[in-house]
């Protein structure tokens, strides 16, 4: 299992975001640590083993429902890929018998006072902290653009005449075009070369 999983991760490395690759890798590492060996065959990963692992995630590691769900889903994805590539038969897929809790997550957002405090925070000119703050603020003021999309943005994505960004959004795979406000424009102008 682990040999296949590592090879599969290397194959998809260039087709997924870095954060997805890291998440998958860390979940495989965590499962390998739980198993205590790299020599695990697909048929050894049973419903009982997965339920024990799920209990270990929650009870021993203190992982919440969302993290437990991610851990099991990553393993299931590796199984599905192995089935698709005819490495194992469909009958070996134990995940359909596993129950995963879905808990509603509370997403926390900064309020206007917190955003203003961050924007007005005195930082040393020319240091990386200032650039990271500007990137974060740009993500807020550019219509909530995901930080990962901000990082890979290029100046060519910006239409200066119309104050619009035309960007391929990594998560959805779609191209979005949207107008940005003065704060975002000022940040772009600050770094224009």
Feature roles, as predicted:
Residues 96-97, 152-192:
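Conserved tyrosine-mediated DNA breakage-rejoining catalytic core shared by Y-recombinases
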Residues 53, 78-79, 191:
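Conserved hydrophobic/aromatic "anchor" residues
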Residues 1-61:
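Basic/aromatic-enriched alpha-helical hairpins
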Residues 30, 34, 40-48, 59-94, ...:
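N-terminal DNA-binding recognition helix of tyrosine site-specific recombinases/integrases
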Residues 55-64, 165-170:
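Glycine- and acidic
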Residues 20, 24-27, 46, 67, ...:
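Hydrophobic (often cysteine-bearing) scaffold residues that line and stabilize catalytic clefts
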Residues 65, 69, 90-147, 151:
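Basic, Lys/Arg- and aromatic-enriched nucleic-acid-binding interface segment
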Residues 56-59, 84, 117-124, 156, ...:
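Conserved helix-loop functional segments at active or binding sites
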């Amino acid at each position: 299992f682990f040999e296949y999983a590592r090879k599969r991760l290397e194959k998809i490395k260039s087709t997924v975001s870095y954060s997805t690759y890291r998440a998958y890798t860390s979940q495989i590492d965590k499962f390998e640590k739980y198993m205590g060996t790299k020599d695990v065959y697909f048929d050894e990963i049973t419903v009982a083993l997965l339920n024990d692992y799920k209990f270990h995630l929650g009870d021993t590691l203190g992982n919440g429902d969302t993290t437990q769900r991610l851990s099991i889903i990553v393993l299931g994805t590796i199984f599905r890929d192995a089935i698709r590539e005819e490495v194992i038969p469909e009958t070996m897929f134990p995940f359909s018998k596993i129950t995963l809790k879905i808990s509603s997550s509370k997403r926390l957002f900064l309020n206007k006072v917190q955003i203003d405090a961050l924007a007005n925070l005195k930082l040393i000119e020319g240091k990386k902290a200032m650039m990271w703050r500007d990137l974060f603020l740009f993500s807020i003021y550019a219509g909530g653009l995901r930080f990962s999309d901000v990082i890979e943005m290029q100046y060519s994505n910006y239409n200066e005449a119309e104050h619009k960004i035309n960007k391929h959004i990594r998560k959805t795979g779609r191209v979005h075009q949207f107008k940005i406000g003065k704060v975002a424009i000022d940040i772009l102008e600050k770094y224009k070369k």
